[in-house]
Amino acid sequence: MDDIQSAALAIEQLKNCVYEITLGRKGKLTRIILAFTEDDLHHLAGLHKLVDIEQIRSGKRSRIYESILSGTITGDFLKKSARYHEIEARIQALVYLEDMLDGDQLYFKYDPRKKAFSRIEADYLVSGKANNTPVYLFLGSRSDDTYYCRSFFPQ
C-alpha cells in the first residue's frame, strides 16, 4: 500500500468519527463539531495542485477517492505530475491526521486578512503534530458549529 492509499484509508477511518471540541476564550465557549467525508481527501492531500493530470484535475472528487482506495489511482500515477513534489509531504503527514486530532493541539481564530501571503479561507487554525511532524490544519464552517477540514500541510 502506498502513501496516497494510506491517506485515503485514514480519511475512511475518520468518516466514522465526529469530533466535538469546546474552545474557551474570555469566558465565552465555542463549540466545534468536526466531521469528515470522502471529498476531504482531495484538498487535504493537495490533489487540486496536480493540474497536469487530467483525471485528477477534472474528475469527480468522490470517484477519485474510490479509485485511490481501490488502487486504480496510485502514488506512482500521481508522481507523474510535475507538481507532485509540492504535495508529497502533505500526503505522508495526512496518514497521521487522526493521531494529530487525538493528541495535543492549539486552536487559533484565523483571520485571512492578516495573512497576506495566504489565500486560505478558514475560521480556525489548528497547530499540532502528525507522526512527530509539526502540521497546520485549517477548519472552515459549514454551519453554526459544524466544521470541515479546509486545508492541511506540514509546517
Predicted regions and their residues:
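Compact beta-sheet-dominated globular domain cores
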Residues: 127-155
